[in-house]
């Protein structure tokens, strides 16, 4: 019981020290940019499409160990990720148009 109390006091002291240095605890976390996250999501969509295309080419060339059900599953995953990306883009465009039509 006493240990938990001491840990609480220590964390409060650390928070006070951070405030004294004019930096908050939230400032120590890395910043995540919207553009970076969007770029990463587009890269993941591209990667799934490339992987599905490669898998389909391997199956077409008759490489051993490549099953039709795996190829179809990868192609569907690729299609679903692309459709999700398109829907996100549509929502972003709609939000942008709505913001632009607002009066200041």
UniProtKB/Swiss-Prot annotation:
Gene Ontology molecular function terms on file: cytoskeletal motor activity; structural molecule activity
GO BP annotations listed: bacterial-type flagellum-dependent cell motility
Record's subcellular location: Bacterial flagellum basal body
Keywords: Bacterial flagellum
Pfam families xrefs: FliE
Keyword Translocase: no
InterPro entries in UniProt: FliE (IPR001624)
GO CC term, one of those recorded: bacterial-type flagellum basal body
Protein family per UniProt: Belongs to the FliE family.
Record HAMAP family: FliE
Name by which UniProt lists this protein: Flagellar hook-basal body complex protein FliE
């Amino acid at each position: 019981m006493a240990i938990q109390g001491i840990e609480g006091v220590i964390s409060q002291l650390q928070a006070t020290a951070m405030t004294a240095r004019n930096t908050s605890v939230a400032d120590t976390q890395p910043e995540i940019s919207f553009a970076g996250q969007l770029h990463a999501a587009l890269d993941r969509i591209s990667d799934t499409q490339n992987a599905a295309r490669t898998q389909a080419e391997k199956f077409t060339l008759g490489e051993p160990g490549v099953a039709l059900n795996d190829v179809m599953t990868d192609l569907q995953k690729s299609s679903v990720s692309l459709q999700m990306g398109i829907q996100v883009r549509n929502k972003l465009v709609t939000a942008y148009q709505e913001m632009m039509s607002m009066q200041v």
